[in-house]
Structures are given as C-alpha cells and as structure tokens.
Design a protein with these regions (language model features):
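Internal alpha-helical scaffold of NAD(P)-dependent oxidoreductase catalytic cores
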Residues: 40-43, 107, 124-217, 273
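Short, charged/polar "capping" segments at the starts of alpha-helices
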Residues: 35-39, 96-99, 141-144
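Conserved small/polar residues in nucleotide/adenosyl-binding loops
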Residues: 283-291
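NAD(P)+-binding Rossmann beta1-loop-alpha1 motif at the extreme N-terminus of oxidoreductases
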Residues: 1-54
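Rossmann-like NAD(P)(H) cofactor-binding subdomain of soluble oxidoreductases
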Residues: 44-124
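Short, hydrophobic beta-strand segments that form beta-sheet elements in well-ordered domains
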Residues: 27-31, 88-91, 134-137
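Interdomain hinge/lid region at the active-site interface
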Residues: 213-270
C-alpha cells in the first residue's frame, strides 16, 4: 500500500523518512504552503504538495500528522473528498480513531497509530525510532492490512482497545513529560545549593541515566536503592524538613509508590512508620495558614 501524509511537522517528516527507509512506498506530504518547507527539507527527496486531492488520489493510506487539536478540523476537510476504501490514520497518543467522526459513512477505515517516542525534530535517527513501540487502534475488519503495512518496520507493534487509550497515553506521559518535571525539581534543589542550571544538570545526568538504564535492565523492584529501600526514616524526615511544600507533595507521592516496591522486596519489614511520616507531612501541607 502507498502512504501519504498531511502535516510536515516533526512526526510527519520523521515517519516519512522512516517509512521510506523501511521500503514503504510514500507518495508525498501535503503542506498548506511551500513556505512551510525549510531549505534543508527541500534538499531531500521528499515530495511536498499543496494539493490534498493529489495526495489522496495517489495514496491508499493517509496519515494526519497534525497537532491533536487540529485532527478533527483536518478530517472534516479530508472527508469531503472521495475516500472510499482508504485508510485514514492519525498519530495522537491520547485520541482514538473515534475522533474521525462519521468515517463509516465515507467508506474509509479509521485508525490511531501512535509511535511511543519523543520526536525532537523533523530528522530522527532510524535506529532510535526503530526501538519505539507502535500502538494501533481502530477498524477491526481491516486491522490485518494495517498490521501488514507496519510489519515492514522492525518495531514492536501492539493493538489497543479504544477505552485503553487514555491510560496508555498517561503511562507515556508519566515516563516522559512528568520525568522532565521530576528532574526539574531536582535541579531546583541543587540551584538552592548554589549550582547553576548547567552544573546541576551535569551533576544529575549520570545518576538519572544510570538509574534509568538499571530500571530497564533489572526491573523497577530490583533497581530500587536509597533511604526507602534501606528503611531509613531519619533521612526521609530530613528531606521533608529541608524542602518546600510543592516538592514535599512530589516527594511524598513518589515515596509512597516506591514503598510498595520496598515492601515487595522486603516482605518481613514494616513500612508503617515511614508511611506515617509521609502522612504527617501532607497533613501539614493541607493545614490552612493561621494569622
């Protein structure tokens, strides 16, 4: 099957190159104006057009690689064309194929195909993207045809139920976006110790990267180290005493989570006293300030 794209952003351009690299036929990419195409992109062998009709005519599968809040708008435009028998896909992690409202009446088949990957730019290394999970949700009757198309790529591909999309996307956000917030709070604590931003991130990098690699090597339970794993309540209390209320909330919530892992690892140890310390810190946070 031949693939076309609407949207020449980071995801669209990266998938375009990646599909070509994996011998999937790509017809081109629609962009509203040629001015949206950078000089670097013009030097590549990508085909860009300002005609949706041309892309649709040449393509069996159309990827709407546009921001989430633009998918329904672009779809409303696409479905005014004759698209019977075509596969219409978007790449949103949070939205399901249902965002392609009324697709059954057009005779086309709707899918959400999401690469679980942080696209940093329009050029993504093939070997990096090859490690990403692709999730597929949508029309069951023609699912095998989409799976066959994607099987040209070396990625692991899984089917998702539409009702699981929000949890699936939340998992991705926990591992990616929220991890940024967590590192930012760690950086701010080092800022308070006199580190500038660069020095703070350089200090945190080997710790964070090594620990993250360890998690994926041995699993979350066996990767756990630190005061919670050692049942070191005094150190936990010192941390809570030293940080502001906003960071206490983060620290307490995540410490409760890793206590679950510690309890699995050390079933004969009671963590009730540590949980009590955390509960007290949260009670103090929720208490109104008295005049």
């Amino acid at each position: 099957m031949k693939v076309g794209f609407i949207g020449a952003g980071k995801v669209g351009c990266s998938l375009y190159d990646y599909f070509v690299h994996n011998n999937i036929l790509v017809t081109g990419c629609y962009t509203r104006t040629q001015a949206n195409v950078s000089g670097t992109e013009k030097q590549t062998q990508k085909i860009f057009t300002t005609s949706i009709d041309k892309i649709l005519t040449k393509s069996d599968v159309l990827f709407l690689t546009v921001p989430d809040d633009a998918i329904s708008t672009v779809w409303e435009q696409v479905k005014t064309y004759p698209i019977q028998g075509k596969f219409i896909c978007h790449c949103s992690g949070s939205l399901g194929s249902a965002v392609l409202s009324g697709i059954e009446a057009t005779g086309a088949y709707g899918y959400s195909i999401h690469p679980m990957f942080p696209f940093k730019g329009k050029k993504t290394a093939y070997e990096d993207l090859a490690q990403a999970l692709f999730s597929v949700e949508g029309n069951e009757e023609h699912m095998e045809e989409i799976m066959d198309l994607l099987s040209a790529c070396p990625n692991r591909i899984v089917r998702l139920k539409s009702e699981d999309k929000p949890k699936y996307h939340a998992a991705a956000v926990f591992a990616s976006n929220l991890a940024v917030g967590l590192i930012n709070q760690a950086k701010e604590l080092l800022n308070e110790c006199g580190f500038d931003d660069e020095a703070a991130l350089n200090a945190l990098k080997p710790l964070a990267v090594t620990n993250m690699n360890n998690i994926f090597d041995v699993g979350t339970c066996d990767a756990l180290t630190g005061p919670v794993e050692r049942h070191d309540i005094k150190t936990v209390q010192k941390h809570l005493d030293a940080i502001d209320q906003e960071k206490k909330e983060t620290y307490s919530a995540l410490t409760k989570e890793i206590i679950k892992l510690a309890e699995t690892r050390h079933p004969d140890t009671s963590y009730a006293d540590m949980k009590h310390v955390l509960e007290l810190s949260l009670i103090h946070i929720s208490e109104p300030t008295r005049p």
